[in-house]
Amino acid sequence: SLISFIGAPWTLLVYMLGLKENNGKINFSKTKNKKFNINIILKDLIYYLCIHIENQINAGADVVQIFDTWAGLIPEPELEKFCYNPNLQIVNFCKSKKIPVICFPKGIKEKYLDFQNMVEPNGMNLDYDIDPLWAKENLTKVALQGGMHPKTLLKSKEELYDEANKYL
């Protein structure tokens, strides 16, 4: 299968508006700046991302993966506006085209369950800080992928097998 990739609207906003500070935190006040109408920017991003996805589908993509690299930096009261709703709109677009969707809301930790239930993607990519047993027990509406910390590859063969078996 050919997987297409897109950045989620929030992640694109972080880069477009320079929201990420050197300390790794988000300057959320910029999203409230009157100079930017953040709601219009979000709406436009979703619109153009859907066009981009349609082009990827027409070029042969079988699956879409949405990377929300900076989702974990969204304050909890803003998750619905900046993470759940934009991803839901894109997921619904993909489903209308009969294309499965994998979402990666990186860094939202215990909010993975809320994301699964609100956005309803076909699959979710796990962060390596998500307990695989918790994920298997709770994220039952989606296919799961990923989750193992990249440093695991530097461990002994036995440790690598033990860690991999947690995900099987």
Question: Where in the sequence are the language-model features?
Answer:
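Active-site loop segments of alpha/beta catalytic cores
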Residues: S1-L168
